[in-house]
């Protein structure tokens, strides 16, 4: 879902006027928004944020600037924001767009600017992007490109440095040119992405005149404004933010926002997405582009930053995961009126230095130094899919914004197709996804458990509200719920162990019911608040196969019983990304849940806490991670509210799930380092935990005890194939045992 053309053609552009007003002689690049800047809060917050960003950058001293490579910016003496929201296609926005159209169509007319030279540096990230959970970097490339411009309109780019590193198995491929080089003039009159293989046939919102009636292509309206006053400049810069939407969303069109200079309509920033009809590749989910310009010498709007995001999925399968190619390029080291080679006009539009020179280029930062800054890891704002869908619905109505087919087969994980365990025996299933509109998605999953002879069904509808909040309605029949404190293994690993070794890493409950959930916030560094209510009927699974099918000498342990009945429950959960001392990043989750039996079974309140953090070297060849999981139950001693721990994923080096209780906590610290190559890693870990509050009847029925205090353990092992596969030896330090454990990277458990 991610290959690129090995020999792309260069992008095409059209001339754009550079401002000719006189002012200070220092560059003032405007602060670009992060990759998820399409998340739109209330107007006054957006206005304040834009003004604060402009002021913060203008007040900064010499040195590296966020999202820009610039030198010695001027200082701002003040800035103001005003509420200037207009109506669609009112007289004011039509006049502004006419100026912008004329500015774009004009030729370079400043006789004092004969040429410039600049350096473009950046990264191309290729990573796995699940709907929920951590991203996984597949490949990262770093480029350095000399940018040369000569009046009236000669643009040449030469790639002078290029290097890459593979972090997960992937075949070799080359990127399209607009992943490696700067797209000139904010794209041509026809917007193309990926040399026309991703997006094609889209009229540029600034290249078409403001038309009336049936000939109108886009609608425009002013949604925000900001004034920036620069030291040494008498007149302030007034910028207007214009929202753009297509008149006919079923045609290849763009949608998004433009930031324009009110004086002459010059483009300052452009953030665009596209309609589904714009996408050439049927694997495309969505594509967004951001182009930003900086003000140099108070008069020239020159390229500053470019971000292109291309998200793809398997066309006919909804796997709940996609891949993203994100390009982040920054332009700096400008030399105005520089002496350029006299034969520059005979150069190809894009050229490369020899291979040896590309490899030996002295990059200013390590290959992986920009992961947090560019929004791949850490605390950077991550685009919220709910907010993106909400923005698209507001601009497109009920026309889907995704390029994916509205109906696909749904396979959330490999074990949803086939699995094996001691309760269900052999299970076979398949699901489907239907997206009738941008605001609603329907998913179904059905299968059959052959050991008990029961169908297993699930249906889920989810959608978004006007302000990006999410909702979900779900129902299931004979769903398998686990009594473990945390999942013990990837489902596929559990199926293999049950099939070949007679080891089942589940303690299942047969659950049927309905659930409704509401999610507020979310996306990047903001708090995610989740409200949930449901009604469930719990039943015990009958003991299925007694022995492993491919090892008849090994018997399964018995299924642990719970009280059967119908239970109502409600919960409140808060999840938030967190910054930890020493540069660690991670997240925390707190959940409060109340449960009560509808037929007098009992009830109570449960609280749970989960913290995760990791620390990595710049080269990502050394890593330390820490996790804390805790849970407490207050109420009637229901078996269904006890949890199990011990062995893999909690306290390795002890028998699997030999402890239980209503209160428990587990702490783990693990470290890993490359053994000369990322293909092999040496791993080690320290673990500790305790469990208490075990009800005597539950202890007798389950054959478990509490831990009797803290139980520590250690582990040492080897990670293989970029740490995807892991073999660890573990030893419990208090009446424990030696264990050899096979596992896979937990980031992939939800896919297996």
Language-model features: where?
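Signal peptide processing junction and immediate N-terminal pro/mature segment
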Residues: 58-73
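Structured extracytoplasmic
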Residues: 71-255, 276-280, 310-419, 521, ...
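Gram-negative/organellar outer-membrane beta-barrel architecture
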Residues: 105, 285, 303-372, 377, ...
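Transmembrane beta-strand segments of Gram-negative outer membrane beta-barrel proteins
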Residues: 114-121, 392-444, 471, 588-596, ...
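Transmembrane beta-strands of outer-membrane beta-barrel proteins
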Residues: 119-121, 271-273, 305-307, 443-447, ...
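C-terminal outer-membrane beta-barrel translocator/porin domains of Gram-negative envelope proteins
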Residues: 174-199, 397-400, 416-418, 471-519, ...
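Extended lipid/amphipathic-ligand handling interfaces
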Residues: 256-258, 262, 288-298, 671
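Predominantly the C-terminal beta-signal and adjacent terminal strand-loop region
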Residues: 628, 632-634, 709, 717-752
């Amino acid at each position: 879902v991610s290959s690129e053309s090995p020999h792309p053609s260069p992008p095409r552009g059209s001339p754009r006027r550079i401002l000719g007003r006189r002012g200070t002689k220092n560059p003032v690049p405007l602060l670009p928004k992060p990759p998820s800047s399409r998340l739109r809060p209330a107007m006054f917050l957006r206005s304040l944020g834009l003004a604060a960003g402009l002021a913060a950058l203008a007040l900064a001293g010499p040195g590296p600037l966020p999202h820009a490579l610039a030198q010695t910016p001027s200082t701002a003496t003040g800035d103001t924001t005003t509420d200037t929201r207009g109506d669609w296609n009112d007289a004011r926005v039509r006049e502004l767009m006419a100026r912008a159209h004329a500015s774009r169509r004009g030729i370079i007319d400043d006789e004092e600017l004969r040429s410039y030279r600049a350096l473009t540096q950046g990264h191309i990230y290729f990573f796995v992007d699940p709907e929920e959970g951590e991203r996984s970097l597949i490949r990262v490339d770093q480029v350095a490109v000399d940018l040369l411009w000569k009046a009236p309109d000669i643009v040449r780019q030469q790639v002078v440095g290029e290097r890459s590193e593979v972090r997960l198995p992937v075949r070799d491929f080359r990127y399209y040119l607009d992943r490696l080089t700067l797209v000139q003039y904010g794209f041509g009159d026809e917007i193309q992405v990926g040399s026309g293989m991703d997006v094609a046939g889209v009229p540029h919102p600034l290249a078409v005149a403001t038309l009336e009636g049936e000939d109108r292509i886009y609608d425009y309206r002013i949604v925000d404004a900001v004034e920036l006053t620069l030291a040494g400049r008498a007149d302030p810069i007034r910028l207007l933010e214009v929202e753009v939407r297509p008149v006919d969303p079923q045609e290849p069109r763009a949608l998004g926002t433009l930031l324009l200079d009110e004086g002459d309509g010059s483009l300052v920033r452009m953030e665009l997405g596209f309609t589904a009809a714009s996408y050439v590749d049927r694997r495309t989910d969505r594509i967004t582009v951001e182009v930003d310009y900086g003000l140099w010498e108070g008069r020239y709007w020159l390229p500053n930053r470019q971000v292109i995001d291309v998200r793809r999925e398997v066309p006919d399968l909804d796997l709940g995961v996609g891949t993203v190619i994100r390009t982040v390029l920054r332009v700096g080291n400008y030399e105005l009126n520089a002496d350029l080679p006299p034969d520059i006009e005979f150069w190809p539009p894009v050229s490369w230095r020899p291979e040896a020179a590309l490899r030996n280029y002295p990059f200013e930062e390590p290959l992986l130094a920009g992961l947090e800054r560019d929004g791949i890891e850490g605390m950077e704002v991550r685009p919220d899919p709910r907010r993106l869908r909400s923005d698209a619905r507001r601009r497109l109505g009920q026309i889907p914004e995704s390029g994916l087919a509205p109906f696909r087969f749904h396979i959330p994980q490999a074990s949803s197709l086939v699995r094996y365990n001691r309760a269900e025996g052999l299970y076979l299933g398949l699901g489907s996804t239907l997206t009738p509109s941008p605001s609603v998605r329907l998913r179904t999953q059905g299968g059959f458990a052959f050991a008990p002879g029961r169908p297993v069904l699930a249906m889920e509808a989810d959608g978004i509200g006007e302000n990006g909040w999410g909702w979900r309605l779900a129902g299931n029949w004979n769903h398998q719920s686990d009594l473990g404190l945390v999942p013990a293994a990837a489902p596929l690993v559990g199926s293999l162990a049950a099939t070949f070794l007679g080891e089942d890493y589940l303690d299942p409950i047969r659950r049927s019911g309905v659930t409704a959930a509401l999610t507020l916030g979310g996306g990047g560094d903001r708090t995610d608040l989740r409200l949930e209510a449901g009604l469930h009927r719990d039943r015990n699974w009958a003991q299925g196969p007694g022995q492993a099918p491919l090892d008849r000498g090994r018997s399964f342990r018995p299924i642990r019983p719970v009280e059967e009945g119908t239970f109502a429950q409600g919960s409140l959960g808060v999840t938030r990304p967190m910054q930890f001392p020493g540069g660690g990043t991670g997240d925390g989750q707190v959940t409060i849940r109340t449960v009560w039996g509808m037929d007098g079974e009992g009830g109570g309140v449960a609280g749970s806490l989960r913290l995760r953090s990791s620390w990595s070297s710049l080269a990502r060849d050394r890593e330390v991670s820490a996790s804390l999981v805790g849970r407490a139950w207050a109420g009637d001693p229901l078996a269904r509210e006890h949890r199990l721990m011990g062995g893999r994923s909690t306290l390795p080096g002890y028998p699997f799930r030999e402890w239980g209780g209503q209160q428990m906590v587990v702490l783990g610290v693990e470290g890993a380092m490359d053994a000369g190559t990322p293909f092999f890693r040496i791993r080690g870990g320290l673990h500790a935990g305790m469990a208490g509050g075990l009800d005597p009847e539950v202890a007798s029925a389950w054959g478990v005890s509490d831990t009797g205090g803290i139980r520590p353990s250690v582990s040492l092992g080897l990670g293989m194939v970029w740490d995807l596969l892991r073999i660890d030896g573990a030893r419990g330090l208090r009446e424990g045992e030696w264990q050899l454990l096979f596992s896979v990277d937990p980031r992939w458990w939800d896919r297996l």
